[in-house]
Amino acid sequence: MNAKHKTVFIAFSSQKGGVGKSTFTTLTASILHYRLGYNVVVFDADFPQHSLIKMKERDLKMVMENEALKKLAYKQFTTINKKAYEIIQHRADSVLEAANEFIGASAIPIDAVFFDLPGTVNTPGILKALAGMHHIFTPITADRVIMESTLVFTQLLQDVIMKKGETAIKTINLFWNQVDG
């Protein structure tokens, strides 16, 4: 691997479920990989749901059982000259080490690693995993409980993790989701 190549670690993270973390992880990874040509990998560390792994398995089964979908998938992957990005199931407490091992063993340089993390700081290793991210994106909704929880979560990241200085975090970005139009 090129020593100058810098892989970016990204997580969509929040203390609440149902705000869109897994959806945004999938959408962003897919756009970067399939549309913009970046090499990405996703680590699904959201125990016990592991919704991204389940989605991958469900989608693969659906494609393999349908000739029309097989042809479309073949056309897509030959057109862009890329395989599907990998989704790897792992535990939050050692996901950073697993990601670094994957990057080191990869034949192609990995541009971005996305992490689908559990929605609670009570999960073993979650604060360490968050401290290893370069960019954290936090979806918020117009629900008072979710907003308060998100602000407390963001304050925790800034006051506890970032002020200690033992972090890779460059940005924490809050954004609105599920907004009525």
Task: Give residue spans per PLM region.
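A generic secondary-structure signal
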Residues: 31, 101-105, 156-164
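A general structural motif
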Residues: 5-7, 37, 108-110, 133, ...
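Walker A (P-loop) phosphate-binding motif
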Residues: 2-38
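Conserved catalytic-core segment of NTP-binding enzymes
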Residues: 41, 118-181
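P-loop/Walker-type NTP enzyme "switch/lid" segment
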Residues: 13-19, 34-113
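Short, function-defining helix-loop hinge/capping sites that tune catalysis or transport
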Residues: 25, 52-54, 112, 123-124, ...
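Short, well-ordered alpha-helices that flank and scaffold nucleotide-derived cofactor binding pockets
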Residues: 26, 30-34, 57, 131, ...
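Phosphate/oxyanion-binding active-site loops and adjacent basic polyanion-contact surfaces
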Residues: 21, 91-92, 145-150
